Amino acid sequence: GMVDPNVNLWIDSCSVEDCTINGAIAVGGILGGGTVYSMTQITNSHNRNTKVTASYNCAGGIVGYADTLYVYSCSNNGTIKGAASTTAPPGNLPANSIYNVGAGGIAGGSGLSTIISSRNSGTVQGSRGVGGIIGSTLVTTQPKTYYNNTFIGFCSNSGNINGDSYIGGLCGEAQLGAYKSYNEGMIEANSSFAGGILGFAPLASITNTANFNKVIASSYSGGIAGSILAGSLGINTNLGEVASYHEYAGGMIGRAGNTLAMNYCSNFAPISGSSYLGGMIGEVGDARKWTIMDGVSLGFAT
């Protein structure tokens, strides 16, 4: 069920089959949750045909949520369902609480996490932060939005992934490192930020990944990522159609920030939408308001 603070847990060679697991917060096929200052390691464990549902936050095929998490050689083919966008929060929560977040084929959410050589083939759905491997590492949205770091290596997803926003074939939203991983499932966001590998990241490094299926969003859709504000892409390939019903669609990224390096990437699929479309990137550049000093600096530079 839960790992207490300052406790180290290792789960190895365990499996759950043909069950139904329902809960409110941190619901997983193998482990529910790991609290702050806990460390969890799960290896060679599998969820087979078990349906996992969290009505509030963090549903995962292997683990619902863990503070510090290491997963190796695990798999899920059960159906994972996170909270719906219409789920109302309890009335006594602080104003800065986050809710209706996190659904993943392996992990719903985490603090610092590393997920290696794991795969998902089950359908994953939720509201915000939905991914084939991990859903969301969102920490807070007030006064600013912050994420924890996750690394995904040698992983794959073949299940369909859908939700409202921040939807990805491997990761919904996080500060992400991804290496030698791929997605074969259809990715769909009812609202914004959908990507074959990643929905959204303020910072990401994605190398040697591939997307093979369709990516659809109302806005911000990309064959690899819906949006990345800063980071690098190298040796990535998209072969899935990318569509935005409104704006920002690209073979690699729907919209990128001011600081991005991209090398040896390729797109072989059609891009469609109403505005800001690109074979590689829909648009590059952060939105900003020009101050008087910015104008003066530009004048002197000119």
Model regions: which residues?
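Predominantly extracellular beta-rich ligand-binding scaffolds that present long acidic/polar faces
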Residues: 1-302
